[in-house]
């Protein structure tokens, strides 16, 4: 019975028959070389030693020779149908611009590499040409100047090599690896900060690997190797018991190692907090607190006694001071406490202030400028003396009142023509008013003309008479 499923029967494993080897096709006699294993190994090693340095040098020293590279064009079979030329995918439009920042070059290049790898089957189509043209327009600033200075064609590999030469990390991968291996956690550094330092160096190494020209399998292997080295650096550089605890957990990568560290730190903190709280509660239950002495003065963290407080500059209630005498001494016998040290009484606030604080410095008065005499025009000067503007002559004298108000004084009877019996009361009052005005006007004219020519004594008599 035939075996329809082509399954190897168990009897085939138990039999002693061995499969017949296939027929060997030997080389002709003129091409056959007898060589031992040692000679073959030496030949392979010699070949690798000759070829490998050239490959490494070519990989590290990227020469911008694009003589064999031309612009990407549309294939002839698609030139009659350019409907897909403007149909650029949104994922390509969402790529951010690159202006020449070296810190952003690694991530930007990886995002473009993923897109270009996805649309590789569309090479030569109008759609691929539109995608490549959109990516070229995303390169602006100094990066655009670098591409134009080398006349880089419209090809992504050529543009990637030029940008890598200008904006990739100039340190070789060996230097970056050594710098990462020397990292340790500082005394005042937290676990999160140390993890951030290790991850930053790992990112630099991975960006350098991404800029190298290698196959995808090689890049994946190198990336995995450096991730393991970063994890080993993080575990070895931790302080305390964390390295031994992480060795038991065996984390797979850096994020899981950080998770275990934070978890162990939180557990240690809770255990220490509970232990300290239990010790404090037992101490309070067994022993009674010792009362402080009467003259106890608190001390600071360094064990030194703090100076007594300084009174305010302007207290609301100043204590009485009896001619600089100190306060009366307090009672020295204390019955409630033991042999407490006696501290002498404090002096008054004024002496204490002078002891702990320097006396205030007097304010320096700013020198005032000397007054300058006023310029007087000689043409307006006069020799006439104005006694009204001499204030020094009126010292110890009665204040003068120049605002003279006339008072209607009763005048003596004046004989008038005509019969007085025939004049009415209104006419008499009008006549008296006119007579008084004439007298006042005469006195004012006399005063205006003669008061300036009188001496001080005569002027006082006249003014007294007018009052």
Curated annotation (Swiss-Prot):
Subcellular location: Virion
The protein's name: Retrovirus-related Gag polyprotein from transposon HMS-Beagle
Organism: Drosophila melanogaster
Keyword terms of this UniProt record: Transposable element, Virion
Region described as Disordered: spans on this chain: 1-27, 272-351, 358-377
Record gene name: gag
Biased amino acid composition, Polar residues: 1-17, 272-284
Purpose: Strongly basic protein that binds directly to retroviral RNA and may be involved in its packaging and in the reverse transcription process.
Claim: Cell inner membrane is one of the keywords in the record: no
């Amino acid at each position: 019975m035939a075996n329809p499923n082509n399954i190897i029967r168990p009897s085939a494993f138990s039999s002693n028959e061995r499969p017949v080897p296939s027929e060997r096709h030997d080389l002709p006699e003129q091409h056959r070389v007898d060589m031992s294993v040692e000679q073959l190994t030496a030949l392979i090693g010699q070949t690798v030693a000759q070829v490998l340095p050239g490959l490494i040098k070519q990989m590290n020293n990227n020469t911008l020779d694009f003589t064999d590279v031309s612009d990407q064009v549309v294939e002839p079979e698609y030139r009659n149908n350019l409907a897909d030329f403007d149909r650029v995918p949104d994922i390509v439009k969402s790529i951010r611009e690159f202006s020449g920042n070296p810190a952003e070059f690694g991530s930007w290049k990886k995002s473009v590499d993923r897109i270009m790898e996805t649309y590789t089957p569309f090479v030569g189509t109008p759609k691929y040409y539109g995608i490549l043209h959109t990516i070229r327009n995303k390169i602006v600033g100094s990066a655009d100047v670098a591409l134009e200075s080398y006349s880089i064609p419209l090809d992504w590999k050529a543009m990637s090599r030029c940008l890598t030469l200008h904006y990739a990390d100039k340190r070789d991968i060996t230097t970056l690896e050594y710098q990462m291996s020397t990292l340790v956690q500082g005394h005042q550094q937290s676990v999160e900060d140390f993890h951030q330092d290790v991850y930053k160096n790992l990112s630099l190494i991975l960006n350098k690997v991404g800029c190298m020209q290698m196959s995808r399998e090689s890049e994946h292997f190198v990336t995995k190797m450096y991730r393991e080295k970063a994890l080993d650096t993080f575990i070895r550089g931790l302080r305390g018991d964390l390295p031994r605890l992480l060795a038991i957990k065996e984390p797979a990568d850096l994020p899981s190692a950080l998770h275990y560290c934070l978890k162990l730190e939180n557990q240690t903190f809770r255990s220490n907090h509970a232990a300290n709280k239990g010790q404090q509660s037992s101490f309070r239950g067994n022993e009674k607190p010792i009362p402080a002495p009467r003259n106890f003065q608190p001390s600071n963290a360094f064990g030194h006694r703090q100076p007594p407080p300084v009174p305010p500059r302007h207290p609301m209630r100043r204590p009485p001071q009896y001619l600089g005498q100190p306060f009366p001494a307090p009672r020295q016998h204390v019955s409630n406490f033991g042999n407490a040290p006696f501290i002498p009484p404090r002096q008054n606030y004024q002496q204490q202030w002078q002891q702990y604080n320097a006396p205030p410095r007097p304010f320096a008065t700013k020198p005032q400028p000397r007054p300058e005499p006023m310029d007087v025009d000689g043409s307006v000067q006069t020799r006439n003396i104005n006694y009204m503007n001499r204030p020094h002559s009126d010292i110890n004298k009665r204040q003068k009142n120049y605002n003279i108000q006339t008072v209607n004084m009763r005048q003596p009877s004046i004989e008038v023509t005509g019969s007085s019996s025939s004049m009415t009361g209104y006419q008499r009052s009008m006549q008296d008013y006119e007579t008084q005005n004439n007298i006042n006007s005469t006195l004012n004219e006399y005063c205006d003309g003669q008061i300036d020519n009188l001496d001080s004594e005569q002027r006082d008599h006249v003014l007294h008479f007018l009052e």
